[in-house]
């Protein structure tokens, strides 16, 4: 994720940031977009995708500008994440709170990415050999007799459920772990390019399957029965802003902003296509199960391509969490921070890949953590830092007004979603949202100086 130095800058510097962000956008939510299309309808899904794509693009551009400004001011913590600029507004405690929220969001994204990879690998193993192999550790329970083994390794039929309560390190877990470590060591344009190519192939085959399964005599609903129910899945698919600040350093703010815009546009088109195809089809199983059930070699290959494509984003999420932990939360060297983030992500993934916790991670991180760290925080920082330009220039008045309006809107939406998930009645949700929207933003708290035009 290291940006190029200014002396190596070229007109194509935006391609590498675009590849990285496309691979982070290519996440677990992609496999449920067909269901989102059925919930929101064809037009509703397209409008949701377009709205979140525009919001993510704007937030990413503002995050690039804030990162450049923080680097120019040489603030403590730097501009490599969104927590560093918070230090100038709310002090060290505020920076640590922001770092904890951002690190948790990144780890949640990593867990969801790992879980999807494991599920795809396990599904491939079951389709090819008809069984699942691995190491199982049974957890203590009242049902566990003294003769039952606490630890065993072997294979079981694909239809046989995992004996509960237990944790399983399946072949899918071990394969995902090995390939993710390899991808992190070989991080670079080639790794990201392979992930992008595999995503294109897998998405094409998934779209072809949806087209085959579309009910010919069924009228496509322009507006589905529950459009808002599709919002969490669509929101989760645009969780890329946290990966933007490291790409905007050392004079690469404009290239990173262009790359973010290209990534959001490309993935918005892919998301909209899948959602529209899903809106016209019958309810399907999750993508891996649906594709493997056909028995076609091309569909088996599609699952493999989707599996490989998901691996490219795991190092990006873990590297971002590592940096936040090391810079703001724990006084540890890079190796210890790396181990802490990796252990947390992989431990949760092993525990969650056979449970409903996976769905909970997607829903809660969409509504709470990602709603705050991916949209609200970058826009609030943009307002507080005086709307810096990508190249040190003054921001247009219209852009400043838009940033302030979106900052208030996202803060109000975040507060309303917290209250809604807590079970508050609608009038409490409305009151909290109104109060949040009307609360003053921390504008002008960052002193501007002539040094803003310099880049470290």
How should each PLM-predicted stretch be described?
Residues 1-35, 39, 56-61, 76, ...:
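Membrane-interface "cap" regions at the ends of multi-pass membrane proteins
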Residues 4-10, 133-258, 266-269, 278-294:
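Helix-loop-helix junctions that connect adjacent transmembrane segments
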Residues 16-24, 81-84, 100, 125-183, ...:
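Transmembrane alpha-helical segments of multi-pass small-molecule transport proteins
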Residues 35-40, 125-126, 157-162, 185-195, ...:
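Transmembrane helix-loop boundary segments of multi-pass membrane transporters
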Residues 44, 352-456:
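A generic transmembrane alpha-helix motif of multi-pass inner-membrane proteins
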Residues 57-73, 77-154, 302-327, 375:
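Hydrophobic transmembrane alpha-helices that form the core helical bundles
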Residues 75-92, 265-312, 331:
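TM-loop-TM module centered on a large, flexible mid-protein loop between adjacent transmembrane helices
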Residues 114, 119-126, 180-183, 194-220, ...:
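Hydrophobic alpha-helical segments and their helix-loop junctions in multi-pass secondary transporters
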């Amino acid at each position: 994720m290291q940006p190029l130095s200014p002396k190596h800058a070229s007109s194509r510097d935006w391609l590498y940031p675009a590849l990285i962000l496309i691979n982070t956008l290519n996440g677990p939510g992609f496999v449920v977009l067909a269901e989102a299309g059925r919930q929101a309808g064809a037009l509703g899904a397209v409008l949701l995708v377009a709205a979140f794509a525009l919001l993510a693009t704007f937030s990413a551009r503002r995050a690039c500008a804030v990162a450049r400004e923080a680097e120019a001011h040489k603030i403590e913590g730097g501009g490599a994440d969104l927590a560093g600029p918070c230090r100038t507004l709310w002090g060290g405690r505020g920076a640590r709170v922001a770092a904890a929220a951002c690190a948790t969001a990144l780890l949640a994204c990593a867990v969801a990415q790992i879980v999807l990879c494991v599920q795809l690998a396990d599904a491939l193993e079951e389709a090819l050999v008809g069984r699942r192999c691995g190491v199982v550790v049974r957890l203590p329970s009242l049902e566990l007799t003294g003769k039952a083994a606490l630890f065993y390794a072997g294979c079981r039929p694909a239809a046989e459920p995992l004996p509960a309560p237990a944790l399983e390190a399946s072949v899918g877990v071990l394969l995902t772990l090995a390939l993710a470590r390899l991808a992190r060591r070989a991080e670079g344009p080639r790794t990201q390019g392979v992930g992008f190519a595999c995503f294109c192939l897998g998405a094409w085959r998934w779209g072809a399957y949806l087209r085959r399964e579309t009910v010919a005599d069924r009228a496509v609903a322009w507006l589905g029965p529950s459009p808002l129910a599709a919002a969490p899945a669509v929101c989760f698919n645009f969780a890329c802003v946290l990966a933007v600040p490291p790409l905007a350093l050392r004079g690469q703010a404009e290239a990173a902003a262009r790359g973010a815009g290209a990534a959001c546009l490309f993935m918005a088109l892919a998301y909209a296509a899948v959602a529209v195809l899903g809106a016209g089809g019958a309810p399907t199983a999750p993508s891996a199960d649906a594709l493997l059930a056909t028995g076609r070699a091309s569909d088996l290959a599609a699952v493999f391509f989707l599996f490989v494509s998901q691996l490219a984003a795991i190092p990006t999420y873990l590297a971002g969490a590592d940096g936040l932990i090391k810079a703001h939360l724990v006084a540890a060297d890079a190796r210890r921070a790396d181990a802490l983030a990796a252990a947390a992500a992989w431990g949760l993934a092993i525990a969650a890949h056979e449970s409903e916790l996976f769905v909970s991670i997607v829903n809660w991180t969409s509504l709470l953590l990602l709603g705050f760290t991916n949209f609200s925080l970058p826009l609030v920082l943009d307002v507080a830092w005086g709307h810096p330009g990508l190249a040190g220039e003054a921001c247009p008045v219209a852009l400043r007004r838009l940033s302030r309006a979106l900052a208030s809107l996202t803060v109000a939406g975040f507060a309303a979603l917290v209250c809604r998930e807590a079970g508050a009645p609608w009038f409490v949700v409305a009151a909290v949202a109104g109060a949040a929207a009307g609360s003053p933003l921390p504008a002008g708290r960052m002193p501007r100086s002539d040094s803003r035009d310099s880049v470290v």
